[in-house]
Amino acid sequence: MSEFSQTVPELVAWARKNDFSISLPVDRLSFLLAVATLNGERLDGEMSEGELVDAFRHVSDAFEQTSETIGVRANNAINDMVRQRLLNRFTSEQAEGNAIYRLTPLGIGITDYYIRQREFSTLRLSMQLSIVAGELKRAADAAAEGGDEFHWHRNVYAPLKYSVAEIFDSIDLTQRIMDEQQQQVKDDIAQLLNKDWRAAISSCELLLSETSGTLRELQDTLEAAGDKLQANLLRIQDATMTHDDLHVVDRLVFDLQSKLDRIISWGQQSIDLWIGYDRHVHKFIRTAIDMDKNRVFAQRLRQSVQTYFDDPWALTYANADRLLDMRDEEMALRDDEVTGEFPPDLEYEEFNEIREQLAAIIEEQLAIYKTRQTPLDLGLVVREYLAQYPRARHFDVARIVIDQAVRLGVAQADFTGLPAKWQPINDYGAKVQAHVIDKY
């Protein structure tokens, strides 16, 4: 039992000897796709030179090329396809001048990539996995039975090599095509958002949801069949361990296991990456909406001021006392109504300044508990502090008190695993759950 393989130098020498090369500008690629499409409609899979010229004429018209030299250009294109091993030409002495053309495996592979493989189908993937599962089960049963070298080659190695491995490659190709489609969707979303983000929101949502759904369907289908496939591969691997002459089968099984792991792993990673991109797009849209809201208001205000003498207007405001009473202790509850939206930097600076002052005061006051080794009941302490501040500051003050308290020590009751009782800390329903700190 042997495995066909070639080294890199051998492959390079082979490609150089046969003068392999592919050059497909967009018009030639379009011609090849047209040939493949027309060829798929024929039962015999053969095309005459006249049919190829007709296909080339359609492509030439689509590219708005001159029709005067279409015969010469079509002949050059056909000869170029034959030279690049995309088409096979067959001639007969009895019908001289009427050659027959067939697509080569290379030509079929290229056109399949652009035509057939672009469509993702959960049913197609399910059928592929069903076929793989059947082949693997038969191979595992044959491996468990054992036999001579011919038995292993025909009933185990051959199905794994020429059926299972090829379907795994097809699934891997489907994933790579999905990668390209994701990138294309990202480009489409970027173009939509750059043009008009308002009109693009619904289109972006549709593209995001469709791609997410397709990725999830692909991954769910793979994970549903993955365990059974791995189990049968392990059965074959266990059967080969008692045979020293089956290293080729063992290596093939290892490669298939690695490929299956890679397929399932990349499927999940692809979903995670797409989720991150989805969040990024939604964050961008939210930011754009906020910026646009402020920009529209500023633009309307600027325009109103500029056109005041042509179109006078009057400013009407309500609740004048609240607007003028800037020293009111309860103004924190109405900051957004009076002054509008603060930039994030100013909000952070205001909160940070208050936090530093409160933290220093609270830290100094709580240090007495540590000095005297007195138990610190967080529920009572927090309630006393909150009684000194308006309701709008309760959350921030409670967070500072708790943060400073837990730095002093720990509660030995925490190590018992029993939950602490909930204690009310203000008259508005806020509660805290914490054991008494008694070890500093």
Swiss-Prot record:
It comes from the Bacteria. The keyword Cell cycle applies. InterPro entries: Chromosome_partition_MukF, MukF_C, MukF_C_sf, MukF_M, MukF_M_sp, MukF_WHTH, WH-like_DNA-bd_sf, WH_DNA-bd_sf. One of its GO terms (biological process) is chromosome segregation. The keyword Transport does not apply. Its main location: cytoplasm. Disulfide bonds: none annotated. It is found in: Cytoplasm, Nucleoid. One of its GO terms (molecular function) is calcium ion binding. Residues 208-236 are annotated as: Leucine-zipper. It holds the Pfam family MukF_C. GO terms for cellular component: cytoplasm; nucleoid. Interacts, and probably forms a ternary complex, with MukE and MukB via its C-terminal region. The complex formation is stimulated by calcium or magnesium. It is required for an interaction between MukE and MukB. Involved in chromosome condensation, segregation and cell cycle progression. May participate in facilitating chromosome segregation by condensation DNA from both sides of a centrally located replisome during cell division. Not required for mini-F plasmid partitioning. Probably acts via its interaction with MukB and MukE. Overexpression results in anucleate cells. It has a calcium binding activity. Belongs to the MukF family. This is Chromosome partition protein MukF. It comes from Salmonella gallinarum (strain 287/91 / NCTC 13346). The gene is mukF.
